């Protein structure tokens, strides 16, 4: 079951490969995610020193968060992958046009995981085509309902 989805990613990118990565989170972040207080629409993934980081995701702290720490809602979070997967991703990202985008946060075995995707950006005409297909599918469903 997914906690947060990045629906914008499927509209803006051609998804080629998916990977499941662990997240290094603080306690207040896990509690906030359980309450559904996160947003990954503006998030992106970068590679630094052979490590992978998630940048730009926003996890709003709960009002009951501890008073002795000052939570940073948009801090950089480290993603945990196997070394071979990281090497493969670095090789692909260095190719022209590939990028890494977060798709969703979900639970697996009580831990929060992040699905990331190796993706290529869509051009404007591709986005328009996707929108036309979606509109046509909606119209087809409407016609089928009206016909029965």
From Swiss-Prot:
Q: Does the keyword RNA-binding apply?
A: yes
Keywords for this protein: Cytoplasm, RNA-binding
* Record bears the keyword Repeat: no
Sorted alphabetically, the Gene Ontology BP terms of this entry are:
trans-translation
Task: Give me the Gene Ontology terms describing cellular component.
Answer: cytosol
Task: Give the domain of life.
Answer: Bacteria
Instruction: Give any Pfam family that matches.
Output: SmpB
Compartments, record wording: Cytoplasm
- Biased amino acid composition, Basic and acidic residues: 129-142
Which PANTHER family does the entry mention? SSRA-BINDING PROTEIN, TMRNA-BINDING COMPONENT OF TRANS-TRANSLATION TAGGING COMPLEX
User: What does the record give as the function of this protein?
Assistant: Required for rescue of stalled ribosomes mediated by trans-translation. Binds to transfer-messenger RNA (tmRNA), required for stable association of tmRNA with ribosomes. tmRNA and SmpB together mimic tRNA shape, replacing the anticodon stem-loop with SmpB. tmRNA is encoded by the ssrA gene; the 2 termini fold to resemble tRNA(Ala) and it encodes a 'tag peptide', a short internal open reading frame. During trans-translation Ala-aminoacylated tmRNA acts like a tRNA, entering the A-site of stalled ribosomes, displacing the stalled mRNA.
Q: What name appears for this protein in its UniProt entry?
A: SsrA-binding protein
> What organism is recorded for this protein?
Burkholderia cenocepacia (strain HI2424)
């Amino acid at each position: 079951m997914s906690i947060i989805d990045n629906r914008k990613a499927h509209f803006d990118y051609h998804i080629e490969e998916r990977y499941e990565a662990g997240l290094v989170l603080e306690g207040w972040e896990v509690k906030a995610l359980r309450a559904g207080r996160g947003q990954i629409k503006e998030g992106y993934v970068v590679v630094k020193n052979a490590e992978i980081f998630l940048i730009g995701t926003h996890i709003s702290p709960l009002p009951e968060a501890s008073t002795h720490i000052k939570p940073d809602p948009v801090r950089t979070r480290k993603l945990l992958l196997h070394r071979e997967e990281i090497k493969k991703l670095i090789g692909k990202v260095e190719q022209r046009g590939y990028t890494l985008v977060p798709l969703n946060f979900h639970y697996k075995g009580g831990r929060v995981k992040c699905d990331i995707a190796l993706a290529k950006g869509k051009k404007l005409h591709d986005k328009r085509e996707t929108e036309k297909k979606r509109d046509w599918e909606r119209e087809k469903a409407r016609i089928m309902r009206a016909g029965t």
